[in-house]
Structures are given as structure tokens and as C-alpha cells.
């Protein structure tokens, strides 16, 4: 999700936990899709698309309930509207079906002020503006878009004590303005720049204790994402057991998903 109104709509849907309904889907002759979801959720059968979308919405609702700190990134103020509603994804539909416009600062602020009074209330919110340029909007169009996002973030941070701004946009475009910090496309940040921004971000929002735990947390998360060449091997079962021991040594961290994965691997391959 790139534009603030689509981000706000997703957060409202998580808070309301209302299921996606068949009437909300579109059909392009091959796939059922939803203007609020990425194309990876589209499917040849409507029930299949609905199942994937509602599973994602349920997961988002659970994450929102559990979160005490939320990081939101505004990517662009340019939006496309279909039948008067802002869409998150155009799904390659004809351009004539959409109206393109730029969100105003007040429009963005109002949407998130309502969220702060509702589902985001009592949570710390960290806002960032994506430093990645949307060149499809032209350099001039990208500049006014980022300006609107930055002004909206500033006003929200001034209005709400639980809202803070992290300057990822300024770090990449001002602090790391040399092109050696950009990838080959000269738009996205290079790995060195990503690591630099991450160091600044973690120092700003994480406690010293949390930063000390990061290597251990990353080790376990990466291990759970690893797909072994021979999952049935005794070596991999022992690998999973060691990861479960490491998880047990960090009871303050929510590793439920990773622990379930390692336990399942041991059971299936025993």
C-alpha cells in the first residue's frame, strides 16, 4: 500500500474485522480481484480469492490488536479513484476507468486523525515518508507528492503526542545524497544505504536492550525462513530442536509462529 488513504482503509478494515464480501470483488474475465488488495490475492475462483483476502485481513487484525507501536510509511499522494473511491491497486484495468488526482494535506491528516481517535488510539505511531521516487509521476509530480506527505506527517506529529516522525526520506535524499548509495536503477536505496537507515531507525525507536537482542531475533527468524535441502534428515531435526531451545531462552519475544514451524518440522519428519 502506497497512498495514505489506502493505508487508512486497511487499518479500518483490521479494526472492524468485517469480512471481504463477494459483492466487493471485480472480475476481469480471468481473475477475481479486489481494488483494496494486491494482485497476488486474485484468483480464478471467487471463493479462492475471498479465502486468501479474508485470511490476510484476519492476520492484520490480530497484528493490530497485539501491537503497541506501529510504523506507517507514506509512499505517494497520487491516487486513482474508481467510482469515486480511492483504490490501492488498479489491477491493469483500462486507464479510462479511473480518475487520477493528488491528495491534499488536510485530507490525509483528517483520515489519520480519525484513526488516532479510534483503532490507533493508545498506540505509538511512527510515520515515515518513502525516499523512493515515483518517477511515473514525473520528477515534478513526485516532488509535490512527497511534499504533501511530509507536511501531513508533520501536522500529525504536532497534533498527537503518540505520533512521531522518523526522517528516512531526509536521511537518504540529504544525508546519503551521493549516488553510490543508490541501486543500479538510481531510484531505490543500495544495501549500504538500507543498513545505514536501519541503524538510525533502530537507535531512534528501540531500547538498548532491544538492540542487543536483535542479532538473536534475526537469527531465529532467518532460520524459520530457511528451506532445507533434506528436511527429513536427522541433522535438520536437530537444527529445529536447537532453534526451539533458543526460543525458550527468549520468553519475552513473541516467537509463536517460528516455534510452531520448528515443532511441525520435527513432527512431520520424525
Predicted regions and their residues:
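Extracellular glycan-modifying ectodomains
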Residues: 1-270
Amino acid at each position: 500500500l502506497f497512498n495514505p488513504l489506502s493505508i487508512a482503509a486497511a487499518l479500518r478494515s483490521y479494526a472492524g474485522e468485517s469480512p471481504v464480501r463477494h459483492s466487493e470483488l471485480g472480475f476481469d474475465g480471468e481473475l477475481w480481484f479486489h481494488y483494496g488488495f494486491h494482485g497476488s490475492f486474485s484468483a480464478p475462483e471467487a471463493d479462492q480469492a475471498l479465502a486468501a483476502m479474508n485470511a490476510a485481513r484476519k492476520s492484520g487484525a490480530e497484528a493490530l490488536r497485539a501491537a503497541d507501536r506501529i510504523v506507517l510509511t507514506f509512499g505517494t499522494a497520487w491516487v486513482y479513484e474508481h467510482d469515486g473511491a480511492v483504490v490501492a491497486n488498479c489491477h491493469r484495468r483500462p486507464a479510462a476507468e479511473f480518475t487520477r488526482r493528488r491528495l491534499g494535506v488536510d485530507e490525509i491528516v483528517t483520515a489519520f486523525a480519525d484513526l488516532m481517535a479510534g483503532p490507533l488510539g493508545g498506540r505509538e505511531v511512527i510515520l515515515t515518508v518513502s525516499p523512493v521516487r515515483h518517477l511515473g509521476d514525473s520528477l515534478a509530480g513526485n516532488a509535490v507528492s512527497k511534499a504533501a506527505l511530509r507536511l501531513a506527517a508533520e501536522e500529525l506529529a504536532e497534533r498527537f503526542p503518540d505520533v512521531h516522525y522518523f526522517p528516512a526520506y531526509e536521511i537518504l535524499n540529504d544525508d546519503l545524497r551521493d549516488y553510490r548509495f543508490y541501486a543500479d536503477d538510481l531510484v531505490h536505496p543500495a544495501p549500504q544505504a538500507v543498513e545505514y537507515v536501519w541503524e538510525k531507525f533502530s537507535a531512534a525507536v528501540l531500547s538498548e536492550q532491544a538492540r542487543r537482542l536483535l542479532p538473536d531475533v534475526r537469527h531465529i527468524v532467518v532460520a524459520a525462513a530457511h528451506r532445507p535441502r533434506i528436511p527429513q534428515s536427522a541433522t535438520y531435526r536437530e537444527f529445529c530442536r536447537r532453534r526451539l531451545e533458543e526460543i525458550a531462552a527468549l520468553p519475552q519475544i513473541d516467537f509463536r509462529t517460528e516455534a510452531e514451524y520448528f515443532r511441525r518440522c520435527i513432527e512431520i519428519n520424525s
